[in-house]
Design a protein with these regions (language model features):
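Catalytic, metal-anchored helix/loop core of enzyme active sites in primary metabolism
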Residues: 1-382
Length: 382
């Protein structure tokens, strides 16, 4: 029985984690969880699982839940996230919080000796230079939940790091992979949220449409697997069957294949190094699929990808600016305040205006993130 804290339990990754846990009640126990604004969904989960420790974002929600459920322990805000991430009984923290907000709980959980199942890629994008040394210092396991990074992690089993020459990061292409640049000018939120393969939250689905998500994954892969940016290649793979691959020095290519089901990488992060059956899952039939396609991304239509490589190579505080500007612009697009193509334009503008801080501290990163968001809002007159 493994004791788990789930951060971001009402989101897409969080609810799929619940599905994994309910499928294996003898393997997993959720001892703590957090939610943002979806209190109705949180209460549904509370009715399914007797989770003792629960953190919420808003004071009003905290007051409501404390009164309604006197037998549960409730926590509030950022401090509450840290408290439930460092509980003595917690063995592994699955961090599925969206965005920069997931950083501090990850840091404190590592310091408390907890293994981390990381779905919050922004943590490594923004602060990989802090997280990776901390993970080594406290001798914890940092396990990827992103399907691509889980695939790379699985493909590396039995290989010596020095014998891996390249990472091949696959990409569905998002909602607009077949749209022209002209068609993208008036793309709507509804169109962007219609992902062809994966069921995900709104923010990451928009990020997939801009290819910002793949850019974030490139930066995450650099930190997770200690590879140079020149050795990370992105391939558009519309079928989302090959979740990513590695190329070895002898030219062998090793990959992980499967149906597009996020529960698989979630479950593997929780059971590593073992495997157990994935309940209610569909097995991959290559004969039914027949043909798999791979091609290079169009970096003129989707300039977020070269911008991400630029941010990663610049290093220091630049990935924080890339991420912060994107989080703000992504939200503005979902709120109907900017057009689709403006998202990446605003990221580029924020990067161009930024002077890189070489080795930013946590406090500096918090300020840089806030400044990038403020820059974007000011740029659009807000």
């Amino acid at each position: 029985m493994k004791n788990i804290t789930v951060l971001g339990v009402t989101g897409s990754i969080g609810t799929q984690t619940i599905d994994v846990v309910l499928g294996h009640p003898d393997e997993f126990k959720i001892v703590a969880m957090s939610a943002g604004h979806n209190i109705k969904k949180l209460e549904e989960i509370m009715s399914q699982l007797p989770v003792a420790h629960i953190c919420v974002l808003e004071q009003a929600d905290y007051d409501y839940l404390t009164e309604k459920y006197p037998d549960r322990h409730f926590y509030l805000g950022q401090e509450g996230l840290i408290q439930i991430s460092t509980l003595e009984e917690t063995e592994i923290v699955l961090n599925a919080i969206v965005g920069f907000a997931g950083l501090l709980p990850t840091i404190e959980a590592i310091k408390a000796g907890k293994d981390i199942a990381l779905a919050n890629k922004e943590t490594l994008v923004v602060a990989g230079h802090i997280i990776i040394p901390l993970a080594k210092e406290y001798n914890i396991q940092l396990l990827p939940v992103d399907s691509e990074h889980s695939a790379i992690f699985q493909s590396m089993h039995g290989e010596y790091p020095r014998e891996i020459s390249k990472i091949l990061l696959t990409c569905s292409g998002g909602s607009f992979r077949d749209k022209s640049l002209n068609e993208l000018k008036d793309a709507t939120v509804e169109q962007a949220l219609n992902h062809p393969n994966w069921s995900m939250g709104a923010k990451i689905t928009i990020d997939s449409a801009t290819l910002v998500n793949k850019g974030l994954e490139v930066m995450e892969a650099k930190w997770l697997f200690d590879v140079d940016y020149d050795d990370i290649e992105v391939l558009i793979h519309p079928e989302s069957v090959v979740h990513s691959m590695i190329e070895c020095t002898d030219t062998a290519v090793i990959g992980q294949l499967g149906t597009p089901d996020m529960r698989l990488p979630i479950q593997y992060a929780l059971t590593y190094p073992h495997r157990i059956p994935l309940m209610n899952s569909k097995r991959l039939s290559l004969s039914d699929i027949g043909t798999l396609h791979f091609y290079k991304p169009d970096t003129i239509r989707f300039k977020a990808l070269p911008l991400a490589y630029r941010a990663g190579r610049a290093g220091g505080s630049m990935p924080c600016v890339f991420n912060g500007a994107n989080e703000e612009a992504n939200q503005l697009f979902r709120d109907g305040k900017i057009k689709f193509l403006e998202i990446v334009d605003l990221i580029e503008d924020a990067m161009n205006a930024h002077n890189v801080v070489e080795n930013p501290t946590l406090d500096e990163l918090i300020k840089i993130d806030a400044d990038a968001r403020a820059f974007v809002r000011k740029r659009v007159g807000l």
